[in-house]
Amino acid sequence: MATHERRVVFFDLDGTLHQQDMFGSFLRYLLRRQPLNALLVLPLLPIIAIALLIKGRAARWPMSLLLWGCTFGHSEARLQTLQADFVRWFRDNVTAFPLVQERLTTYLLSSDADIWLITGSPQPLVEAVYFDTPWLPRVNLIASQIQRGYGGWVLTMRCLGHEKVAQLERKIGTPLRLYSGYSDSNQDNPLLYFCQHRWRVTPRGELQQLE
């Protein structure tokens, strides 16, 4: 009796299933709600910018420093309240990409596909924004991790670039062999390299197949 290998499919989130950058929107929201933290963030920006230039856009600690600056000095209860407020705002303002979400649904309806949603946005935000969708409980989620530290929130893992490859390898082993991958960003090229079928999502939510 023939055995059929399961198809492993990767989806990015920001710019792929929806238009906006969830984590970037969250940081801007925090500063709008807590303008005094901008006094801390402003002198950190040159350090963050130089570090991203040297380390690359996928580096963890520069963005962790930015998150810390946006959240420093506030209790966990206050930050959780702000996060809940942001989630409500984001759900009201997010622009979904129906064509990409239709592809996701098609894979979920098949019996031979394992779906991995791998995103640079923090896991608590992703789970809170999409808690009531039929697809979130049925995908395997890998996302950036945040925790309390040094009087604010910090990133303990930033799931971007080559880190996406490393995280997926920890879950399913090596060598990676993916059937298909969907992303808007060149940052995901390291993971798309392992995909048999590669799809680029345009800023308008259209799909272009890559060679």
Curated annotation (Swiss-Prot):
One of its GO terms (biological process) is phosphatidylglycerol biosynthetic process. It is found in: Cell inner membrane. Disruption phenotype: No visible phenotype. Simultaneous deletion of pgpC and pgpA increases phosphatidylglycerophosphate (PGP) levels almost hundredfold relative to wild-type. In constrast, simultaneous deletion of pgpC and pgpB leads to a twofold increase of PGP levels. Lethal when combined with deletion of both pgpA and pgpB. Pathway: Phospholipid metabolism; phosphatidylglycerol biosynthesis; phosphatidylglycerol from CDP-diacylglycerol: step 2/2. Residues 1-33 are cytoplasmic. Its EC number is 3.1.3.27. GO terms for cellular component: plasma membrane. Residues 55-211 are periplasmic. Coiled coil: none annotated. The keyword Nucleotide-binding does not apply. Keywords: Cell inner membrane, Cell membrane, Hydrolase, Lipid degradation, Lipid metabolism, Magnesium, Membrane, Metal-binding, Phospholipid degradation, Phospholipid metabolism, Transmembrane, Transmembrane helix. InterPro entries: HAD-like_sf, HAD-SF_hydro_IF_YfhB, HAD_sf. Its main location: membrane. It holds the Pfam family HAD. Its cofactor is Mg(2+). GO terms for molecular function: metal ion binding; phosphatidylglycerophosphatase activity. It catalyses: a 1,2-diacyl-sn-glycero-3-phospho-(1'-sn-glycero-3'-phosphate) + H2O = a 1,2-diacyl-sn-glycero-3-phospho-(1'-sn-glycerol) + phosphate. It is a single-pass membrane protein. It is an enzyme of class 3 (hydrolase). The chain crosses the membrane at residues 34-54. NCBIfam families: YfhB_g-proteo. Lipid phosphatase which dephosphorylates phosphatidylglycerophosphate (PGP) to phosphatidylglycerol (PG). This is Phosphatidylglycerophosphatase C. The gene is pgpC.
